[in-house]
């Protein structure tokens, strides 16, 4: 069993057991996956600026509890699989601020991503409990790192072939065979972690 499933299954059992037994409502699951923008790099300290525009004042009110601290959803939970290098892991709990970019997967990063206001909005809009499954890594490519198996191996286009097999230059791999072997090894790595 994949490490991510080993972590996620107990969380799902806990959430389903508590919420569904009490409410007998289906669990609404949303998957948020992506790169650096999905990680989220907005610091909690920047919340005040949202109040500068009258159009976003209602959003700021939703983001904060009565004491001015970030809101904590009672009906929405999050499982966030992320990490740096080989140190991938899961952070989970009731949805609140701190599930943005994290250097340590299980520690509050003091940041938010789209999961925060998305989760607050879904919690307010839906009567059922909400689970957000988020997975995100910055600095990764869609054509290699997140490439799904059904897309096949990454193929150089004609321009790349002409450029890469031409004269040496900036950004051109020095050892094409090694570069292609690494590309093959890396293809789909983060897609598999995500799934």
Give names to the regions the model predicted.
Residues 1-7, 122:
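Positively charged n-region of N-terminal signal peptides that target proteins for export
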Residues 3, 21-22:
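Short, low-complexity interaction segments enriched in Ser/Thr/Pro/Gly
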Residues 6-17:
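Bacterial N-terminal signal peptides
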Residues 22-195:
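Cell-envelope and extracellular/periplasmic
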């Amino acid at each position: 069993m994949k490490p991510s499933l080993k972590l996620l299954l107990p969380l799902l059992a806990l959430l389903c057991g508590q919420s569904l037994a009490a409410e007998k409502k289906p669990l609404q699951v949303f998957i948020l996956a992506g790169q650096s923008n999905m990680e989220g790099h907005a610091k909690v300290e920047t919340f005040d600026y949202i109040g500068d525009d009258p159009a976003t004042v209602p959003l700021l009110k939703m983001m904060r509890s009565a004491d001015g601290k970030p809101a904590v959803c009672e009906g929405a939970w999050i499982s966030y699989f992320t990490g740096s290098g080989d140190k991938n892991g899961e952070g989970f709990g009731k949805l609140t601020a701190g599930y943005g970019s994290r250097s340590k997967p299980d520690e509050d990063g003091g940041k938010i991503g789209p999961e925060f206001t998305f989760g607050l909005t879904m919690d307010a809009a839906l009567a059922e409990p909400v689970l957000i499954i988020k997975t995100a890594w910055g600095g990764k490519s869609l054509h290699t790192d997140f490439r799904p198996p059904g897309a096949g191996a990454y193929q150089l286009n004609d321009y790349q072939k002409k450029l890469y097999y031409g004269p040496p230059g900036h950004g051109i791999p020095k050892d094409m065979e090694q570069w292609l072997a690494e590309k093959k090894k890396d293809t789909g790595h983060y897609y598999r972690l995500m799934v």
